[in-house]
Amino acid sequence: MATIEEIAHQIIEQQMGEIVTEQQTGQKIQIVTALDHNTQGKQFILTNHDGSTPSKVILARQDSTPGKVFLTPDAAGVNQLFFTTPDLSAQHLQLLTDNSSPDQGPNKVFDLCVVCGDKASGRHYGAVTCEGCKGFFKRSIRKNLVYSCRGSKDCIINKHHRNRCQYCRLQRCIAFGMKQDSVQCERKPIEVSREKSSNCAASTEKIYIRKDLRSPLTATPTFVTDSETTRSTGLLDSGMFVNIHPSGVKTESTVLMTSDKAESCQGDLSTLASVVTSLANLGKTKDLSQNSNEMSMIESLSNDDTSLCEFQEMQTNGDVSRAFDTLAKALNPGESTACQSSVAGMEGSVHLITGDSSINYTEKEGPLLSDSHVAFRLTMPSPMPEYLNVHYIGESASRLLFLSMHWALSIPSFQALGQENSISLVKAYWNELFTLGLAQCWQVMNVATILATFVNCLHNSLQQDKMSTERRKLLMEHIFKLQEFCNSMVKLCIDGYEYAYLKAIVLFSPDHPGLENMEQIEKFQEKAYVEFQDYITKTYPDDTYRLSRLLLRLPALRLMNATITEELFFKGLIGNIRIDSVIPHILKMEPADYNSQIIGHSI
């Protein structure tokens, strides 16, 4: 007797059909032994895919028309059943109904969708499909959507379950002959904006991440590309992590929030971008009355030809303060109040060090860090959208960056170094502070999902030849370093005091070239280390090597490339503007003005 595989191949060769999911129960079935090979109407038994008890007897008879088979369950009644091979390799499928109604006549044929079994509306893109699968295939190809299957890539696709797995549905469309090159490019509006913001990268590629609150690792990233848009020429060839346009539409697989809805439920999700844009616009407005050379300097701001530090000299303190109105949303007002009071309470403990190195630093007794420096509460954009986009990720990252700078400003010893030294330290070590913040806010930011999405998008770009292997390797190494570092920190169960002292040790690093008062900075670092050691000795007396384990994690921070961090987390908000160009504006604000804005503009 022939095997199941041989019978399946015979049926396919005779164009008699193929076995697929049964529509009523959604249960997958496979062809088994033909009971009688001599009868004109061939008889089959359909069983479950695991070979369990036979479920139904099917009588199949060949009609005079080649390639058509009429099926009657249990030799009576009217029913519809269609077939496919288990590996979805079939090139043809014909579904027919044996209808005995006297009004319609015998053997009336109904064309059903080869993908899901719904009533077909015609041949679309090379295959007989329904309107639903036609639209799904068109959207997927036009927008170059990439789906992922949460199962074993063999999900049931029928009329009732076709929306559960977009990956398997798209693969099924392609397997049954729907041609990708038959989908025409989407028509563009006649009127196209001739100018694009110089502060944002020119790209409309987006990442949409399906949120799963139960598991941060089960994300379904969707990668959207507009090939007709001018692309950024930054580190990522195709600007794949950039999202410029917040507007969108609702589809079966992804909810793209419209701009007005996003504003109403999330507030201003462009904190960092608003700061950069506001500063640039302020400079352009004030410079209208100045000569053309100064105007050229301002116009080159967004191209990173001129440092934002130079641009700062043209602004008054009031103008800069107003430009940072949106920055206040990034921070917790309660925490800012505590930090402000702590700074005020410690006035007089240190004397500010000016550029004149002849002034000696004097210090009163007291710790480098107080209890107010332990709290590090990141306020995420609220509420979280059902599907996170890269703009939301960038806004979350910018809030973490601002919170880290605000934390540094709240340390009296840091302020005592003077403005130039403070700016130099933060510009040198913002990436290390940001990475420590990622580890500390691992769960709040859902960092695991963000990193997994970056990896999936890099893999997709390589498959589509959008990125060289060397470039992909560079980015993947950085992402894996981030993941390894954050995972190691999470496993150590580091508390708030330990994170605060680790950040202080990183912040007061005297080995950056160009720093003044290096001996004083080194003294602050030594004090942070001594206090850190005392805290661990008192808090974890039984963990002899805890201090060593924590300090040994710091060298890994130096391996993180700040340029790649900017590409991944911030380019979608500020384009090619460098983070170290924005830092001076934040640190040059007066603490009182900074904190008052936080209190007055909290979310």
UniProtKB/Swiss-Prot annotation:
Protein source organism: Macaca fascicularis
Region (Required for interaction with NRIP1): 584-603
Keyword hit for Zinc-finger: yes
Residue numbers carrying Phosphothreonine: 220, 222
GO biological process, one term: positive regulation of retinoic acid receptor signaling pathway
Cross-link (Glycyl lysine isopeptide (Lys-Gly) (interchain with G-Cter in SUMO2)): 250, 588
The protein's name: Nuclear receptor subfamily 2 group C member 1
Protein's UniProt keywords contain Phosphoprotein: yes
